[in-house]
């Protein structure tokens, strides 16, 4: 296995779509959330990372889709902060409700399309 590729948790859930959260240090520190969908990774840059309370929203800037090899990619400026699988609960043009099942458990989020950007919200109702 090349030195910049790691095994992902999602491999133990082969029928579930994977996600990865990258800790990206350049051009300025931010996180990238990538959700497997339709053979690509839909991606959002998170300048302040994942929300930690349901009372806050975090800006999520949609960026171009990435190839599936980014599930395991890291380099000197990008590390894998978390990985696992995700499940969608509801979707409309303006909102995606989903749960990330990562290394520290399951957390439910909503991605809300504001028209110009997205907001990432940690929901009050969390997965059991």
Descriptions of predicted regions:
Residues 1-128:
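A charge-rich, low-complexity, intrinsically flexible signal that marks solvent-exposed coils, linkers
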């Amino acid at each position: 296995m090349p030195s910049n590729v790691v095994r992902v948790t999602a491999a133990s859930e082969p029928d579930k779509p994977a996600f990865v959260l990258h800790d990206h240090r350049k051009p300025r520190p931010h996180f990238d959330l990538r959700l497997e969908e339709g053979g690509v990774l839909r991606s959002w840059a998170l300048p302040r990372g994942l929300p930690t309370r349901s009372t806050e929203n975090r800006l999520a800037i949609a960026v171009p889709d990435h190839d599936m090899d980014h599930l395991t990619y890291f380099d000197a400026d990008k590390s894998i902060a978390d990985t696992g699988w995700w499940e969608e609960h509801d979707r409309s043009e303006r909102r995606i409700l989903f749960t990330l099942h990562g290394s520290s458990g399951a957390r439910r989020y909503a991605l809300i399309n504001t028209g110009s950007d997205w907001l990432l919200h940690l929901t009050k109702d969390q997965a059991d």
